[in-house]
C-alpha cells in the first residue's frame, strides 16, 4: 500500500526540499567555503548542509516563514539570488515555482505516493548539483552573498523583517529549466538564470 502525503506533510516536504536546495547551491557555487558544510544523507543521496550557526539560523528563519505561507497557500515562488558583493549585481537567480494543487483527491490516479515524490526530488537535486558543469565559474573567492525572495499573495501576512523588493531578474540572461516534483498538494519546478 502506498503512502500519500497530507497538506502538512506536503508543506514540510517542500520546505525541506528548499532547505537542502539552498544549502546545495551555496556550497556548489562557492558562496560559502567548503569547510562550512558537512555531508548528510537525505533522499538516498549524500548532500551538504551548513554547520555555520549564523547561516543555519538565517536559513531556518526564512524557511519557517515560507512554511507558514505554503501551509496557507500564500507563497507561489521562492527565489535564491547570488549577488556580487562589490557590484551588487545578481549573477545567478535560482527560481522555485510552487503550484498549489487543490481538490486533487477525487480519484486514485491523482494520488502521489511518497516514493514517487522522493524519486522526483532526487532527480531535481541531482540536476541542481550537476549545474556546476554548465554555469559560468564564480571567480571572486568570498566575493558573493545571497538573498532570498518569496513571492506571496497580496493578502499574505508579512513579518517586519521581510521587505518588498524588485524581482532581481537578470536582463538577457541564459535560462535553464530543471525537472519538477509533485506531492498531493504542491508541484514544484525549478530553473536557474545566469549571466553568460
Curated annotation (Swiss-Prot):
* Domain HORMA stretches: 8-192
Give the domain of life.
Answer: Eukaryota
Glycosyltransferase among keywords: no
Q: Which Gene3D superfamilies match?
A: HORMA domain (3.30.900.10)
Which keywords does this Swiss-Prot/TrEMBL entry list? Cell cycle, Cell division, Mitosis, Nucleus
Tell me where it resides.
Nucleus
Q: Which GO terms describe its biological process?
A: cell division; mitotic DNA integrity checkpoint signaling; mitotic spindle assembly checkpoint signaling; positive regulation of protein autoubiquitination
Q: What is its biological role?
A: Central component of the spindle assembly checkpoint which is a feedback control that prevents cells with incompletely assembled spindles from leaving mitosis. Thought to be recruited to unattached kinetochores by MAD1. During checkpoint activity, MAD2 is relayed from the MAD1-MAD2 complex to the mitotic checkpoint complex (MCC). MCC and presumably the MAD2-CDC20 subcomplex inhibit the ubiquitin ligase activity of the anaphase promoting complex/cyclosome (APC/C) by preventing its activation by CDC20.
Q: Remarks, anything else? A: Present with 1110 molecules/cell in log phase SD medium.
Subunit comment: Component of the mitotic checkpoint complex (MCC) which consists of MAD2, MAD3, BUB3 and CDC20, and of the MAD2-CDC20 subcomplex, both of which appear to be assembled during mitoisis independently of the kinetochore. In mitose-arrested cells, MAD2-CDC20 occurs in a larger amount than MCC. Interacts with CDC20 and BUB3.
Which family is annotated? Belongs to the MAD2 family.
Q: State the protein's name.
A: Mitotic spindle checkpoint component MAD2
- The species this protein belongs to is Saccharomyces cerevisiae (strain ATCC 204508 / S288c) (Baker's yeast)
Q: Which gene produces this protein?
A: MAD2
Amino acid at each position: 500500500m502506498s503512502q500519500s502525503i497530507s497538506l502538512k506533510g506536503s508543506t514540510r516536504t517542500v520546505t525541506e526540499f528548499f532547505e537542502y536546495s539552498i544549502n546545495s547551491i551555496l556550497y556548489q557555487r562557492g558562496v560559502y567555503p567548503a569547510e562550512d558544510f558537512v555531508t548528510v544523507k537525505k533522499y538516498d543521496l549524500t548532500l551538504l548542509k551548513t554547520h555555520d550557526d549564523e547561516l543555519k539560523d538565517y536559513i531556518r528563519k526564512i524557511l519557517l516563514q515560507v512554511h507558514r505561507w505554503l501551509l496557507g497557500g500564500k507563497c507561489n515562488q521562492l527565489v535564491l539570488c547570488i549577488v556580487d558583493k562589490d557590484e551588487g549585481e545578481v549573477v545567478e537567480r535560482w527560481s522555485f515555482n510552487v503550484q498549489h494543487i487543490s481538490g486533487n483527491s477525487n480519484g486514485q490516479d491523482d494520488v502521489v505516493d511518497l516514493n514517487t515524490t522522493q524519486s522526483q526530488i532526487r532527480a531535481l537535486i541531482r540536476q541542481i548539483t550537476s549545474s556546476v558543469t554548465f554555469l559560468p565559474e564564480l571567480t571572486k573567492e568570498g566575493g558573493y552573498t545571497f538573498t532570498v525572495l518569496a513571492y506571496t499573495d497580496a493578502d499574505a501576512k508579512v513579518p517586519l523583517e521581510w521587505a518588498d523588493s524588485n524581482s532581481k531578474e537578470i536582463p538577457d540572461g541564459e535560462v535553464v529549466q530543471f525537472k519538477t516534483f509533485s506531492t498531493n498538494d504542491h508541484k514544484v519546478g525549478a530553473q536557474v538564470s545566469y549571466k553568460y
